């Protein structure tokens, strides 16, 4: 299945993402370093049961890079701010999180901050921060 990547501007930077299917949102967050490409084999199947949304995290995949390797936008909090605003801009609700590696820590925080929007969490090779 070929799906064209879309782009949205978040905090003045372009975030690339895939968005296809209908129904409850299945938000898939990749690890570091990686990209939405990680989910290429499972996403088409999941799109038959829901709306699959897969961003390339800031600085990864086809998303825009930040200036300077020590840019605070690459910190955990910086990454989280991009994901949080991404979800707000796309009005994501009824979210099933599918999270991996670095994306798991971001997803767990998203679940903590917006528990009313999260329906389920599936995680792999997770990084767990204190709640």
Where does each model-flagged region fall?
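Active-site loop/oxyanion-hole signature of alpha/beta-hydrolase fold enzymes
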Residues: 54-99
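Nucleotide-sugar-dependent glycosyltransferase donor-binding/catalytic pocket residues
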Residues: 34, 72, 129
């Amino acid at each position: 299945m070929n799906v064209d990547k879309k782009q949205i501007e978040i905090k003045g930077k372009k975030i690339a993402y895939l968005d296809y299917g209908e129904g409850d949102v299945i938000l898939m967050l990749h690890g570091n370093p990686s990209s939405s490409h990680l989910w290429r084999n499972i996403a088409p199947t999941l799109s038959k049961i829901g709306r699959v949304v897969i961003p390339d995290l800031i600085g990864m995949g086809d998303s825009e890079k930040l200036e300077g390797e020590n840019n605070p936008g690459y910190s955990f909090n910086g990454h989280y701010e991009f994901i949080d605003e991404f979800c707000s801009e796309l009005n994501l609700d009824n979210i099933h999180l599918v999270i991996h590696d670095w994306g798991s820590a971001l997803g767990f925080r998203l679940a903590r901050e917006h528990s009313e929007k999260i329906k389920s969490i599936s995680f792999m090779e997770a990084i767990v921060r204190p709640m």
